Amino acid sequence: MDANLLGEKYAISVGVDIKSLRMWLIILSCVLTATVVAFTGPIAFVGITCPILARMICGTSKHIYVIPVTMLLGAVFLVVADILTRPGVLISSTNVLPLLCPLSIIGAPIAIIIYLKIRKMGI
């Protein structure tokens, strides 16, 4: 994957079959995404925001660093959101909030910050 990030010409020069790699990456992405959504539900914020934050934290796009940081960020976000949904944390009630409520509260400012940083960088 890292060779593909450096461009098609570089990937071809080091012996990567671009068409095959892209096909397998698309298939793998679809299968993994479908599996995760089937088990956890559509928590889109975590899946979209954590990889972007991981790249910003790592300062690189090398997958050997970004993937573990993304997994840790996703786990931390979900644990924090789960703690916030417990009774008496955000609201003083015996009811439990849906998980997407605190994710939206946490996610909106983070998404705005990411958007502003990306816009500032001109990407």
UniProtKB/Swiss-Prot annotation:
Q: Does the keyword Lipid biosynthesis apply?
A: no
The GO terms describing molecular function are: transmembrane transporter activity
Q: How is the protein disposed in the membrane?
A: Multi-pass membrane protein
UniProt main location, coarse: membrane
Taxonomically, which superkingdom? Archaea
Tell me a GO cellular component: plasma membrane
Q: Which SUPFAM superfamilies match?
A: ABC transporter involved in vitamin B12 uptake, BtuC
Q: What does this protein do?
A: Probably part of a binding-protein-dependent transport system. Probably responsible for the translocation of the substrate across the membrane.
- Keywords, A to Z? Cell membrane, Membrane, Transmembrane, Transmembrane helix, Transport
User: Where located?
Assistant: Cell membrane
Instruction: Please state what the protein is called.
Output: Putative ABC transporter permease protein MJ0877
Residues annotated as transmembrane:
26-46, 64-84, 96-116
Ligase recorded as keyword: no
Q: Which family does it belong to?
A: Belongs to the binding-protein-dependent transport system permease family. FecCD subfamily.
User: Which segments of the protein form a coiled coil according to its record?
Assistant: none
